[in-house]
Regions:
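Acidic, glycine/proline-rich low-complexity segments that act as flexible tails and inter-domain linkers
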Residues: 2-110, 121-123, 127, 279-284, ...
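Residue-level signal for inorganic ion chemistry
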Residues: 61, 147, 203, 315, ...
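A generic, well-ordered mixed alpha/beta core segment in the N-terminal half of proteins
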Residues: 94-165
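Structural motif
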Residues: 95-98, 125-128, 170-178, 196-199, ...
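Short, ordered loop/turn segments at secondary-structure junctions
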Residues: 132-135, 178, 245-247
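Phosphate/diphosphate-binding glycine-rich loops and adjacent basic-rich segments that engage nucleotide
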Residues: 157-219
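Glycine-rich ThDP/TPP pyrophosphate-binding loop and its adjacent helix/strand module
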Residues: 211-257
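A hydrophobic, small-residue-rich beta->alpha segment in the mid-to-C-terminal subdomain
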Residues: 266-325, 334
Length: 353
């Protein structure tokens, strides 16, 4: 009955009633589902981040959106919501390297990104990272946990303190519970549905950095990479590097070719990195636990131990991809010099003091 329907619609409240309409667009059947426009995707995620949709609604939306797969247009709208409502960092006058890796962490291979970030920052390349607490579905080790094991704590800091570290040392990590609590409200819903929703894709495409940058985004499946290119182009991301890294991260493997691509000024260039062609033959270090990783990580920062060769390869590759040097062999020489000089280790000591 129309009157009863209108009464119930009014009882939901404006935000929940509108969100129910948006659920209908992504959750209808094969022949009636229309998907969302960019503006509607922005609106839907904004309603969730501001708490104007309730838990059952958010769960329904996220799982329906996962099943039908977000379009690049929808991802662009959601990315704009993250940009507007999320934390913001700047590196005035300096081009930053910004990494997007899965928030649910690592549980099979030893992470290199904290060590890479420290050494790149020591070389004068600002690095901006972001992450959160252990996250569904993997609940792997997080960037914040890894840094903390090295004596560098990012959790519990104000955003101003993170910006100060970025200004002084060239390295930043925003922590979602502290710096983006609106996004943190989605974590219990993600836990309940037990699958990665499209929001997980945003964590690879978004960065809190504002200004000139090279955005480095990890991926696993080829369709994810092409959607990332389209979505980021739609929001005018100037320079993108996609990396088929370990466990969806941006860590380049040493046991196989590294598959990357650069998108700049609308042109995509596929770049394959073959470690064996440059004398890199180290096996891929496995993950065991934080304490063991800490020992190996501190050794690698001093050019020793089982992670050292993998770190050297990644450091060289990113020095070259960031155009710090013109040729990859030259980058390997520079990476070796930085590790032997313990540049990243020295920065860690300065930041942890």
């Amino acid at each position: 009955m129309p009157g009863r329907r209108a009464q119930r619609h009014g009882a939901l409240g404006e935000g929940r009633a509108r969100f129910r309409e948006l659920i209908g667009k992504v959750g209808s059947g094969e022949h009636t589902s229309t998907g969302l426009s960019r503006a509607e995707a922005y609106e839907a995620l904004t309603l969730m981040l501001r708490g104007e949709a309730d838990g059952p609604q958010m769960g329904a939306f996220l799982i329906a959106h996962r099943i039908r797969r977000p379009t690049p247009e929808e991802l662009a709208g959601m990315l704009e919501a993250y940009r507007d409502l999320g934390p913001k960092l700047q590196t005035p006058g300096r081009r930053a390297l910004c990494f997007g890796v899965p928030y649910d962490g690592r549980d099979r291979t030893a992470p290199l990104l904290p060590l890479l970030a420290l050494t790149l920052a020591a070389e004068g390349l600002p690095v901006v990272l972001h992450g959160g607490e252990p996250m569904p579905v993997k609940y792997g080790v997080t960037l914040a946990e890894l840094f903390a094991s090295l004596g560098l704590e990012w959790r519990g800091l104000s955003l101003a303190a993170v910006q100060e570290r970025l200004d002084r040392h060239g390295l930043a990590l925003t922590h979602q519970p502290d710096h983006f609590p609106a996004a943190e409200r989605l974590v219990p819903i993600r836990d309940a549905i037990g699958k990665r929703p499209p929001v997980a894709s945003l964590e690879l495409l978004w960065t809190p950095h504002q200004g000139q940058r090279l955005l480095v985004s990890g991926f696993v499946h080829p369709p994810t990479e092409s959607r990332a290119w389209e979505a980021l182009a739609a929001v005018s991301e100037a320079e993108i590097l996609t990396v088929k890294g370990l466990e969806g991260s941006t860590d380049l493997p040493t046991s196989r070719a590294g598959i990357t691509a650069r998108r700049r000024q609308g042109v995509v260039e596929r770049i394959l990195l073959h470690p064996r062609d440059h004398g890199i033959t180290a096996p891929q270090p496995a993950w065991s636990d934080v304490d063991s990783w800490r020992v190996d990580a501190l050794a690698a920062l001093q050019d020793e131990g089982p992670l050292a060769e993998s770190l050297r390869w990644n450091l060289a590759a990113y020095l070259w991809l960031a155009e710090r040097v013109s040729e990859l062999p030259e980058a390997l020489e520079r990476a070796t010099a930085l590790l032997r000089a313990r540049a990243g280790w020295r920065l860690l000591q300065a930041m942890a003091a």
